[in-house]
């Protein structure tokens, strides 16, 4: 049961990361050397 819970958390974090990376990639003012 704990393994299933960790797996679900990992998938959720993975999708959130994809969403954030997609949002940043669509930002025309994106600069790899700048952190906001």
Curated annotation (Swiss-Prot):
It comes from the Eukaryota. The gene is psbI. PSII is composed of 1 copy each of membrane proteins PsbA, PsbB, PsbC, PsbD, PsbE, PsbF, PsbH, PsbI, PsbJ, PsbK, PsbL, PsbM, PsbT, PsbX, PsbY, PsbZ, Psb30/Ycf12, at least 3 peripheral proteins of the oxygen-evolving complex and a large number of cofactors. It forms dimeric complexes. Keywords: Chloroplast, Membrane, Photosynthesis, Photosystem II, Plastid, Reaction center, Thylakoid, Transmembrane, Transmembrane helix. GO terms for biological process: photosynthesis. One of the components of the core complex of photosystem II (PSII), required for its stability and/or assembly. PSII is a light-driven water:plastoquinone oxidoreductase that uses light energy to abstract electrons from H(2)O, generating O(2) and a proton gradient subsequently used for ATP formation. It consists of a core antenna complex that captures photons, and an electron transfer chain that converts photonic excitation into a charge separation. The keyword Flavoprotein does not apply. Its main location: plastid. Belongs to the PsbI family. The keyword Ribonucleoprotein does not apply. The chain crosses the membrane at residues 4-24. It is found in: Plastid, Chloroplast thylakoid membrane. One of its GO terms (cellular component) is photosystem II reaction center. This is Photosystem II reaction center protein I. InterPro entries: PSII_PsbI, PSII_PsbI_sf. It is a single-pass membrane protein.
